From Swiss-Prot:
SMART domains: Calx_beta (SM00237). Ca(2+) 6 binds at residues 584, 610-612. The gene is SLC8A1. Residues 1-32 form the signal peptide. InterPro entries: CaCA (IPR051171), CalX-like_sf (IPR038081), Calx_beta (IPR003644), DnaJ_domain (IPR001623), Na_Ca_Ex (IPR004836), Na_Ca_Ex_C-exten (IPR032452), NaCa_exhngr1 (IPR002987), NaCa_Exmemb (IPR004837). It comes from the Eukaryota. This is Sodium/calcium exchanger 1. Activated by micromolar levels of Ca(2+). Keywords: Antiport, Calcium, Calcium transport, Calmodulin-binding, Cell membrane, Glycoprotein, Ion transport, Membrane, Metal-binding, Phosphoprotein, Repeat, Signal, Sodium, Sodium transport, Transmembrane, Transmembrane helix, Transport. Residues 93-133, 189-201, 250-797, 843-871, 925-941 are cytoplasmic. Its main location: membrane. Mediates the exchange of one Ca(2+) ion against three to four Na(+) ions across the cell membrane, and thereby contributes to the regulation of cytoplasmic Ca(2+) levels and Ca(2+)-dependent cellular processes. Contributes to Ca(2+) transport during excitation-contraction coupling in muscle. In a first phase, voltage-gated channels mediate the rapid increase of cytoplasmic Ca(2+) levels due to release of Ca(2+) stores from the endoplasmic reticulum. SLC8A1 mediates the export of Ca(2+) from the cell during the next phase, so that cytoplasmic Ca(2+) levels rapidly return to baseline. It catalyses: Ca(2+)(in) + 3 Na(+)(out) = Ca(2+)(out) + 3 Na(+)(in). Ca(2+) 2 binds at residues 417, 478-479, 531-532.
Amino acid sequence: MLQFSLSPTLSMGFHVIAMVALLFSHVDHISAETEMEGEGNETGECTGSYYCKKGVILPIWEPQDPSFGDKIARATVYFVAMVYMFLGVSIIADRFMSSIEVITSQEKEITIKKPNGETTKTTVRIWNETVSNLTLMALGSSAPEILLSVIEVCGHNFTAGDLGPSTIVGSAAFNMFIIIALCVYVVPDGETRKIKHLRVFFVTAAWSIFAYTWLYIILSVSSPGVVEVWEGLLTFFFFPICVVFAWVADRRLLFYKYVYKRYRAGKQRGMIIEHEGDRPSSKTEIEMDGKVVNSHVDSFLDGALVLEVDERDQDDEEARREMARILKELKQKHPEKEIEQLIELANYQVLSQQQKSRAFYRIQATRLMTGAGNILKRHAADQARKAVSMHEVNTEVAENDPVSKIFFEQGTYQCLENCGTVALTIIRRGGDLTNTVFVDFRTEDGTANAGSDYEFTEGTVVFKPGETQKEIRVGIIDDDIFEEDENFLVHLSNVKVSLEASEDGILEASHVSTLACLGSPSTATVTIFDDDHAGIFTFEEPVTHVSESIGIMEVKVLRTSGARGNVIVPYKTIEGTARGGGEDFEDTCGELEFQNDEIVKTISVKVIDDEEYEKNKTFFLEIGEPRLVEMSEKKALLLNELGGFTITGKYLYGQPVFRKVHAREHPLPSTIITIADEYDDKQPLTSKEEEERRIAEMGRPILGEHTRLEVIIEESYEFKSTVDKLIKKTNLALVVGTNSWREQFIEAITVSAGEDDDDDECGEEKLPSCFDYVMHFLTVFWKVLFAFVPPTEYWNGWACFIVSILMIGLLTAFIGDLASHFACTIALKDSVTAVVFVALGTSVPDTFASKVAATQDQYADASIGNVTGSNAVNVFLGIGVAWSIAAIYHAANGEQFKVSPGTLAFSVTLFTIFAFINVGVLLYRRRPEIGGELGGPRTAKLLTSCLFVLLWLLYIFFSSLEAYCHIKGF
């Protein structure tokens, strides 16, 4: 399980934290060498103080100097309360990150005009991924640290404190060393994860190191011990400057600005693809909000319009192939599973392999830690249940309808002219089946006429109690006249329901529209195929579209205007842009033999599925000249005398066909009609024989209108649409978002199973573990409380965003007071408490989020790419905003905002040196012998993780030594 998968190095680090904290709290009392360097400022003291100060919210716990036992009790209460507050912050931060995921997933529709004049509509994300990661995403993951710094300054009469800035620096150290060490270690042996957007990583890493270097400059170089207004404001304004630089790197706007580019509508997902090269000869125009933007105009490079480069194009194609493989393998792997289980497995696998944001991993980690379960599996199960339930509702809704529907089973019927009668089925569905229902029917002429082509029929059908199906018959009149296919109509009308039966058994019927009515179809069309002709053979249509996943394609060859005699029709496939021989389809040829009265046959062609996302290839299917089976011989005779002939059991043009008996010489009967040419030359025909010959020729089978069928092979529509849905990132916003307060309260009180270790896709619901129950009951108060936060559906996530950040600020104020009171209770300095305990508490959710991202994501960006950007944002927002407010306040009162440079400047310098080492090692790991920033051979993983953990321990150790004046700072 995720919650028990911390590495041994990280566990060892946690133990060392406690040892270091206890060591320095005792050294504080054992050592006598202390100095007082500041004036009333605690940062200048070399020892902690047992005397606590009033917090922003919490009062002082009196008396100030309790006994040793009371100190232990108080420290325990403060520590437990602080941990509980950290749990609360994690849960409300989960809601906060959900709102951010929804906000950054917003899309806008644009229209692409192609050079040929065609237009297509597609959607693009409003938020650039890099911009959202550095603004809302970073704010979401670092909100407690940022708000703690601001609240501490504003809550203590705009004076500088140690807790906020030290928490920011300590959190940065924890993120840079411990989180990256964990991510390096948890990747399976032999696997690697590389940073995909290396340019963005370089920019954010440089800004991260610069941010802490800048802190040292304003504290110790520019104006030692004083933060001026311009320094505070410039620190804050570095934040948007950093975002712009990262966006420029992501969009390649510096060097690439001077390279001509062209844009085309990409085949994948309808996205816009960027190409670099020569000036294009034609323009692709793009409409956004009604404005047309030319393809090579610089302003086209808007971050809101997510232009995809070829690299992304290839990645999407690979992802689609992977999705197609999953869809095909699931049914083969689990043929015994029911539809709900298969849907759940497919949804889970697809969601698991999607590219995810930092916000998603943070939400997933928090919910797994607090017993809320795996949101991907829960969403997949919910979707499966909805799909199955909708199917059941659609099939059962008619059965539960209170009104009986009366309708024909099908809207069209076909029959041959010699069939005698045609049967039509009437269905009764829904309503009270104990009633007796009457419905009238009546035939109506179409191209067929009553009396000459069919028998006029009308009457009433009675559905007795319990009966749901009735059959009516209409007589068909056969003649020997060649005719086109004809049709007539049969109408249903006048539905009546029997309310009661009289004593003599006669049913009394009345119109009750609330009990029964006509359904659809209430009119049936009957087509009569003429059987006096050998037939006209044709395809249904000249062009047909088939999916490449169809497997065996079946094409109908129709026999119209007659069905008399046995006829052979040859057929064959012809290559077009699609290739035969098993490449796109298998070559097929042969003959169709239509038996007497048979009106349709099918040709089967195997289509090869090569899993192309978009496909448009053609081949042709052609039928040849039809021939009667008997006319394949030299003579075709119509006989009405036996003589020296024997009956064959076959018919030609309505007459029995005879065959001459060998070794018997009889004169040719006078009634023989010859069709062979040799007899035409020797024997003139009478007018009667000529008429019979003409009729016989008219009855020969011929080809119809569509003798050549164009077959267009396309990608499977279901396959294409499914893949599009699976790979679309915005689905994750639906997974983490909520639609109603009811849904939120149900989630709050429900305990769910955490992560599976084996992930064996068993399809069986996993029961919550003991850990899940314990964490659920520990956090249920926070879950229910924060269920009152508006759902992410409202205001596109902004309502949830605003309320959540206010809640985080309130809890952070409590955490600041508890941490400060905990420190003074055990005489631990605020700076040490912040660097060790507070930084650790605020970073635990990020630790688990990075661990999940490192193991599940294809790249290292989601796990460690956000660390550097978050560190820079912490300084520019957390310290920049707080110090700007304080500096302006003091300047307005004619005072200076004093900040002791000692401990903070030393910590910043130490962190900066270690950060250079960290980034250098990560870049070295990209060499071929290791292959990426994360993972790699076991030895390399272990050495890297141990080095980073050692850097963090050294940072804690030296910062604590400096705080207690055992080594000299700045």
